[in-house]
């Protein structure tokens, strides 16, 4: 199931925002109350949540992967908790990166599963117990679920895209916010500003005034080799496809044609056939994101996959010690929780 944020969410407020204000006010009231009153189950392992304030992509999954890699360097055994966008399992399911399809577990869990065990379930606490019992995980990283998960979070790292910030600053449906910033900041442990830009400056200052530590990071291609001088038809079904197109250019590729699709889009045969035909006619290579490639593994022909280049992304923190600090502060909060119980 694909989703696409309305363009006006990322623009200056207009009449549409005004018309939706009553609904936004109701949504904000309910969302804030849910966050404040939710019963969150405490589990035996520390829980680090990588979330965001808004609907849409902010680069959480590469951040979660980077933190899992840091946890491994600290001799921990990380595991991921994910709802799994579009997933179809009623009970907690541990993802098999080689055999599971994105339509069953979601695209992001397939990427996460290449680095650590992943439990897909809306019941994060049940998923946590499964990972601890069957895989010996002793450090759990939750990809999303900041506002809704019914599990105690020891550290909530909120990722904000520097290019888009929090959009028009309004709550759903008038804007991209999942709840009022003041309500979300209460449960925020730290804020990570991703990339370059000034759109997030206001919320960064607000978080800093609230005493939350501010981290910075950027997304970098894992390998730029082979892209320089190549001409591409780039396509992507992610939160902000234009960010991907820019990354291809920054890596040395020439984006001659670009085709955006809705976030989490599952490609139909005729769409893939059209992409391949246009690329062939124009003498272009095909390039897409790792998330899109995960969705295509069980849906595209082998010929299409053989022609496709995938741009892998890594999260690079501005301060080398930042990931270690985040892990340590999660562990400290967990130890304090254990002492109080």
Curated annotation (Swiss-Prot):
GO terms for molecular function: ATP binding; tetraacyldisaccharide 4'-kinase activity. The keyword Nucleus does not apply. ATP binds at residues 54-61. It comes from the Bacteria. GO terms for cellular component: plasma membrane. It is an enzyme of class 2 (transferase). It catalyses: a lipid A disaccharide + ATP = a lipid IVA + ADP + H(+). One of its GO terms (biological process) is lipopolysaccharide core region biosynthetic process. Keywords: ATP-binding, Kinase, Lipid A biosynthesis, Lipid biosynthesis, Lipid metabolism, Nucleotide-binding, Transferase. Its EC number is 2.7.1.130. Transfers the gamma-phosphate of ATP to the 4'-position of a tetraacyldisaccharide 1-phosphate intermediate (termed DS-1-P) to form tetraacyldisaccharide 1,4'-bis-phosphate (lipid IVA). Belongs to the LpxK family. This is Tetraacyldisaccharide 4'-kinase. It comes from Mesorhizobium japonicum (strain LMG 29417 / CECT 9101 / MAFF 303099) (Mesorhizobium loti (strain MAFF 303099)). The gene is lpxK.
